[in-house]
Curated annotation (Swiss-Prot):
Cofactor(s) it depends on: FMN
EC number, as in UniProt: 1.3.5.2
Pfam families according to UniProt: DHO_dh
Organism this protein belongs to: Erythrobacter litoralis (strain HTCC2594)
GO molecular function: dihydroorotate dehydrogenase (quinone) activity
Protein name: Dihydroorotate dehydrogenase (quinone)
Residues that coordinate or bind FMN: 58-62, 82, 136, 167, 206, 234, 256, 285, 306-307
Subcellular location: Cell membrane
Transmembrane intervals: none
Summary of the function given for this chain in its UniProt record: Catalyzes the conversion of dihydroorotate to orotate with quinone as electron acceptor.
Annotated catalysed reactions: (S)-dihydroorotate + a quinone = orotate + a quinol
GO CC terms: cytoplasm; plasma membrane
Topology with respect to the bilayer: Peripheral membrane protein
């Protein structure tokens, strides 16, 4: 209710300034740190017990500034990042565009972040607070050895992470998506799976929606072979459906409502290709309870939101979690785990 009143003022700001405002507000607001505790929503993925399956996707809290405030809003987990070894400014501004008529966002941020030292200091300071925190890592744009960057980041962030995500699917770092190719992916996973050590947190992989069937099959096969913790499906798309907003032709990754059909189909593709052998995290165009329920029934053990928060506000996580509780009761299910892949 409150967000609907202040949304016009927030949306009058430049999108990047509005995002910064939201981070600063979360730092300052006296938020009630009550987490949704319906036991029927608890789900175990890669050995981690998630209190509910609704999380914040990477990209919102790039520098690990407000993970605990987000958990206090009712999210079951928060994925911070993407974080790179060295600080980088990202691409020139403007680089973030709000497509209000399409309930979408286009970004070409380019892994802008304060770097590993800053993130590590913040994550170390809050480590005793608990909660499920994923850390999404990337490579510096000018790196001579991107696989080494990923291995370094996984090793450095492992002590503070519930899980680690190798983000090789951003369209805004030239050549990054080439790491999804079969040979490169095998080398990457060999490096990052070894980096955290035998007792380290599980490693997830975030993939693009813009994949051919052969790519899906190859990624699924390698992920199973390497014992990946989960696949996050999917990142933003470079494709452009029929959009109505003024900034529809800006370059970058498209997220929000127009991504939903593609992200849902790609999730189903990976569910089929993996045969349920690896947990899936559904992300892309999830804005409602029905969206989350559909993604879970299509095979997602967890779901993540980000762009929808631009339009629905910070209460979205708690709203979806409560709605999923109702869905379980309506379908006579005792646990959200019963709903996974039940379509």
């Amino acid at each position: 209710m409150l967000f609907s009143l202040i949304r016009p003022a927030i949306h009058a700001l430049d999108p990047e300034r509005a995002h910064r405002f939201s981070i600063e507000a979360l730092k300052l607001a006296p938020l009630p740190h009550s987490r949704h505790s319906d036991a029927s929503l608890s789900v175990k993925v890669a050995g981690i017990r998630f209190p509910n399956p609704v999380g914040v996707a990477a990209g919102y809290d790039k520098d690990a500034e407000v993970p605990d405030a987000l958990l206090g809003l009712g999210f079951g987990f928060v994925e911070v990042g993407s974080i790179t070894p060295r600080p980088q400014e990202g691409n020139p501004k403007p680089r973030l565009f709000r497509l209000s008529r399409d309930r979408a966002v286009i970004n070409r941020m380019g892994f802008n972040n304060a770097g590993a030292d800053v993130a590590e200091r913040r994550l170390r300071a809050r480590a005793a607070k608990g909660g499920v925190i994923g850390i999404n890592v990337g490579a510096n744009k000018d790196s001579d050895d991107r696989i080494a960057d990923y291995a370094t980041m996984v090793r450095r962030m492992a002590p503070y992470a519930s899980y680690l995500t190798a983000n090789i699917s951003s369209p805004n770092t030239p050549g990054l998506r080439a790491l999804q190719d079969e040979g490169a992916l095998t080398g990457l996973l060999d490096a990052v799976m070894e980096a955290p050590g035998a007792d380290g947190p599980p490693v997830f992989l975030k993939v693009a929606p813009d994949l051919e069937p052969a790519d899906v099959d190859a990624i699924a096969r390698i992920a199973i072979d390497k014992g990946l913790g989960a696949l996050i499906v999917s990142n933003t798309t470079i494709f452009r459906p029929d959009l109505q907003s003024r900034d529809r032709d800006e370059t970058g990754g498209l997220s929000g409502a127009p991504l939903k059909p593609l992200a849902l189909q790609r999730l189903r593709d990976f569910r089929s290709a993996t045969g349920g052998a690896i947990p899936l995290v559904g992300v892309g165009g999830i804005a409602t309870i029905d969206d989350a329920w559909e993604r879970i029934r299509a095979g997602a053990s967890l779901v993540q939101v980000y762009s929808a928060m631009v339009y629905e506000g910070p209460g979205l996580g708690r709203s979806i979690a409560r709605g999923l509780s109702r869905k379980l009761r309506e379908h006579g299910m005792a646990s959200i785990e019963e709903a996974v892949g039940s379509e």
